[in-house]
Amino acid sequence: MVFAMLVVCWSIFLGLWMLVSRLKQSRDKICPPKGPPRLPWIGNLHQFPLKLLHLRLTEWSRTYGGFYTLKLGPVTAAVITDRQIAKEAFDRNSAISSTRHTNYATEFVTDGTHLLTMKYGALWREERKILQQTLKGSVCDNDHMRLIDAEQTQLMRDLLVNPSDYSAYIKRASTSIITSLVFGIRTPSCATLHLQELDAINDDWLQLLVIGGALSEDVFPVLKYIPSAFLGTFTKRLKGIRRRMRRLYGTMLNQTITRQRESPAPPARSMIDAVLNQREHFNLTDRQIEVLAGVTLEGGFDTTTSMLLVFVQAMTLHPECQERAYVEINALCGRHRIPQWSDRNQLPYVNMLLKETMRWRPVTTLSPPHVLEKDTTIRGTFLPQGSMLILNTWGLHQDPNVFIDPDRFDPMRYEGYTKLAADYANAPDAATRDHYTYGIGRRICPGIHLADRSMFLAIAKLIWGFRFEPQRDEQGNSIPIDSNPVTGYTVDKVQISPKPFACAVIPRDKEGEKTILREFGVASEVFADYNLDENASL
């Protein structure tokens, strides 16, 4: 219905737009297009799928190279599947390549204050600074690892109790880490109300970003002139997502404000505590604080959950990798101590395992498009102001010139890669970059330090405590696991995640079980620092 309405409106304005476009052509600098053939006026829009776009762009890169252009209506889009060109376009040209297009759907839902989709400017820099101060490496090491360790120890305890619900327990742990750090509010169980609501909102939001990306006002200029009432059920959907976001994030913000009034010096200080205590310095409205908190929740729980499920899938399919990692961990820790973050430098294979997990099935297959604020030329191709720059993360990770047999899961690709992802992202030589799952340029994921630490520790703990094996049917045969990126993964959202798969999570031994239960008792002392009000009204 929405698409049909857009087609009708597009037809109404097409004549005027064609006239304006012809007048502009006389001023535009023209260069031969390098990319798939395009049609007049619509360019490549008819070839632009809403599902599996990363596979289409990667397929084109095999034909047209690591840098080619598309035409999406009046907008030029440059697709980058080359490390050196990515470094040039997003890092060296970051002063002009860090903004976003105006997006009808996300503007409607968030009032233009969502950090992921917000245009580059003063507010973006202010909110980004808050996240960087909260999530930088030194703060993670000194302040956050205690909580992360405790939450992942509960994950191990939960898996002892009911291993068949491994997916739900992974989501709970990932959610509790981020809600605790953002609001000082834990997510103690899978039944916690805000977990269920956040999960539902995030699912709608990620699907909306796919549709919303197609509703850019720069790609469809007519959207600027269409009253929202004419978009019918789509507008109702946007209003519903907006209402639910405001209810959840606003409730959690109000809980934090109330707690501050009742206890001015809480044992554990959250990001929102810090923002509220420095309101005059940050100069943010309640609405901006609310959306900033929501951005952090959305980015922190779902991606980590999906990446840990990718890890579990990879271990189930590759027992030899799992066993090698276990031997390394057990040689260091034995059965009376669970791995800690401080063990990282002595666990090189676990580090390789993490990096290969991030490369093999990156949950973010394409970066949200950056937009040029000025005309520029990249590798001899002129790109006008307003052009999109799309980082093809999937294509970079599946490049056979960089990774031999790229679809094979092989942690040994990263032998000698001893640093964290942020170090390689900031390195001057693009050839040394480990992976692009966290993005690139000024808009690289601000949670890169937290996510890398959380993922490493979860992987080390899970391998120390459990074996991951295929489940068996009644005849004792292994139930196949589909890791195919087309059939085995979700494809209707901007992020991918494994579809449910049959995995047996088996505790390694009784001694390890005793250690997990003992360490969970210690973790419970950490949880006392956080608000456990899981029954607050939403």
UniProtKB/Swiss-Prot annotation:
GO CC, alphabetical: membrane
UniProt superkingdom: Eukaryota
Membrane topology: Single-pass membrane protein
GO molecular function: heme binding; iron ion binding; monooxygenase activity; oxidoreductase activity, acting on paired donors, with incorporation or reduction of molecular oxygen
Binding site for heme: C445
Annotated EC: 1.-.-.-
InterPro entries registered for this protein in UniProt: Cyt_P450, Cyt_P450_E_grp-I, Cyt_P450_sf, Cytochrome_P450_fung
Subcellular locations according to the entry: Membrane
Transmembrane segments: 2-21
Cofactor field: heme
GO biological process: mycotoxin biosynthetic process; terpenoid biosynthetic process
Main location: membrane
Sorted UniProt keywords: Heme, Iron, Membrane, Metal-binding, Monooxygenase, Oxidoreductase, Transmembrane, Transmembrane helix
Pathway noted in the entry: Secondary metabolite biosynthesis; terpenoid biosynthesis; Mycotoxin biosynthesis
Protein family: Belongs to the cytochrome P450 family.
Protein name according to UniProt: Cytochrome P450 monooxygenase verH
